[in-house]
Amino acid sequence: MIKIYNTLTREKEVFTPIEARKVRMYVCGPTVYNYIHIGNARSAIAFDTIRRYFEYRGYEVNYVSNFTDVDDKIIKAAKELKITAPEVAERFIKAFEEDTQALNVQPATLHPRVMDHMPDILAFIEVLIEKGFAYEVAGDVYYRTRKFPNYGKLSHQSIDELEVGASQRTGVEQQLKEDPLDFALWKSAKEDEISWDSPWGKGRPGWHIECSVMATKHLEETIDIHGGGQDLEFPHHENEIAQSEAKTGHTFANYWMHNGYVTIGEDDEKMSKSLGNFITVHEMIQKVDPQILRFFMSTTQYRRPIRYSESTLKEAAANYQKLKNAFENLRFRQADAVASLPEDEHYLAQLNELEQRFITEMDDDFNAANGITVVYELAKMMNQYSEQATVSEPVLVAMDKLFSGWLAIFGLFFKNEELVDAQVDALIEERNQARKDRDFARSDEIRDLLKEQGIVLEDTPQGTRWRRSE
């Protein structure tokens, strides 16, 4: 059974879906005003892996992740780029899709956009006003934080603790509020800013209301899982709970999941645009195979921080190559496999035992770090089996299926390089013939040519194998 660490309770809990074998999951998506950096990509990759594991375990996942296409940062970017806010959003939604596709992140079941939900947002706010949870002042609408009795339950903060911080804020907005703790649901329009008509005058929605509206519209009033980065726990997710539960009277999400940061530098600073210590995915995938970056990001337990450095990335690349070599060794032996061998049942039983161990590790709050350790064990077993003089098709097929299935959970695959492979095979065949003809000069020439292309040859009793160098 799958256990999830629930931020709400600070405990691991057995996952019990609202509807049997189905998962309703909402994850906060990007604010689309720039290219995403690898810290942003952590969330997309973490929840893609979680989604894939649910599917591996037989669940049907309805996965909704939004695009925030209305925001102060987008308005600022529009002014700097001298284009409209919708044009900024469209440009960077496309960039996000290209970057995540390169990282083999599956598109969500639905990617709703704020601009497409204005009538829903207005209706949601009106209900909160009618219930006394919100009020209008000077064209702005604010949420009455103290009216929601359980405010602070997600971040485990009391109203008194929050009040100390809020009382130190200044500005016109603070003067308009009934209480420093109140937060904006609707912001009145400023000159030359994108805006929409509302019962309170022209304006645009606050950040927190958007996710409450889109989650409850597309996944019902109560959802199984709400996820996002740790930095969203407060105030964003806390405010989502207050808004949603005040409107519906029901629990908003049963499980709250938060992924860890990507850190960088000797002080392990959180990677962020505000600190200027970030590397965009767009830049990174020009230098590094996106699959290696995906591997680097996928194989740490999602709640743990990932320390980015040249050395940790190189280590990931080396481990990825070891898995690829094991896969290529296995595929190499398929051509000469026999129909069956007496020891087949022994190997198939070992594979079944490995699969159960993998499931046990991943069922424990999607512990990818422990899960990938089992993948390494399978790779070692594959290498040892491939070295045998005689191998059987049933064992090769079972190993291939298990290995490929596990890699898919982590969003990994080995690129189809059939044309290149065919060229390599042709050169190896020519080299073999040259050796038979005792034309060692040509044999060495072919070996050197392949080496220059990153192809390493290994002459074995079963024939010449090749692999791409690390």
Curated annotation (Swiss-Prot):
Keywords associated with the record: Aminoacyl-tRNA synthetase, ATP-binding, Cytoplasm, Ligase, Metal-binding, Nucleotide-binding, Protein biosynthesis, Zinc
Residue sites binding ATP per the record: K273
Subcellular location: Cytoplasm
Keyword Nucleotide-binding: yes
Cofactor remark: Binds 1 zinc ion per subunit.
Group of enzyme by EC: ligase
GO CC, one annotated term: cytosol
Motif 'HIGH' region location, chain numbering: 30-40
One annotated GO molecular function: ATP binding
Gene3D superfamilies: Cysteine-tRNA ligase, C-terminal anti-codon recognition domain, HUPs
Cofactor section: Zn(2+)
Catalytic activity: tRNA(Cys) + L-cysteine + ATP = L-cysteinyl-tRNA(Cys) + AMP + diphosphate
Enzyme Commission number(s) from the entry: 6.1.1.16
Domain of life assignment: Bacteria
Principal cellular location given in the protein's record: cytoplasm
CDD domains: CysRS_core
Motif placement: 'KMSKS' region: 270-274
Family: Belongs to the class-I aminoacyl-tRNA synthetase family.
Protein name: Cysteine--tRNA ligase
Originating species: Enterococcus faecalis (strain ATCC 700802 / V583)
Gene from which this protein is expressed: cysS
